[in-house]
């Protein structure tokens, strides 16, 4: 399970995040799983930093329900949105399965994530499909393929997997 080393995520949010990234990037014969790759750490660091606090977002409103092409239309910082989505996903998972996401079997996780990504699961005011597709998945892919200095892609494992040598450290 998660340790207290996270900067932004609570232990429950970290457990959900680790389960998400491990399901989306499972450990196999090719290498480490998502948590070992540092994807959960990357997500936590992004949410704990300037990005997570909405440093470059206009958050003064008015906030109206828009279309997907209108972009981000919420009065929440990315960190607040991530946490609201975690709470919503946990509540929806408890209602559907009677247990949290990190305790589900792989097939249950897959079915649930497909329903979330497809917009079939709502949790109160949180559109979990929008949350997953516009926040979680981009953070996941960034964490997998970013420069390891940001916490993800440990040992450049994702780069090695796709044959990318990385940038030379020359000055």
Where in the sequence are the language-model features?
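Mature-region segments of soluble proteins
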Residues: 2-3, 11-19, 23-26, 30-171
């Amino acid at each position: 399970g998660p340790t207290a080393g996270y900067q932004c995520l609570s232990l429950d949010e970290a457990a959900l995040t680790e389960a998400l990234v491990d399901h989306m990037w499972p450990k196999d014969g090719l290498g480490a799983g998502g948590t070992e790759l540092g994807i959960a750490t990357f997500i936590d660091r992004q949410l704990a930093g300037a990005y997570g606090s909405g440093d470059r977002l206009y958050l003064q409103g008015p906030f109206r329900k828009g279309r997907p092409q209108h972009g981000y239309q919420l009065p929440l910082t990315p960190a607040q949105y991530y946490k609201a989505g975690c709470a919503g996903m946990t509540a929806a998972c408890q209602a559907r399965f009677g247990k949290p996401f990190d305790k589900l079997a792989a097939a249950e996780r897959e079915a649930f994530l497909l329903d979330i990504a497809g917009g079939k699961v709502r949790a109160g005011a949180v559109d979990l499909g929008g949350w997953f597709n516009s926040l979680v998945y981009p953070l996941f892919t960034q964490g997998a393929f970013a420069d390891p200095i940001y916490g993800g892609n440990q040992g450049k494992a994702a780069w090695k997997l796709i044959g990318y040598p990385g940038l030379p450290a020359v000055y």
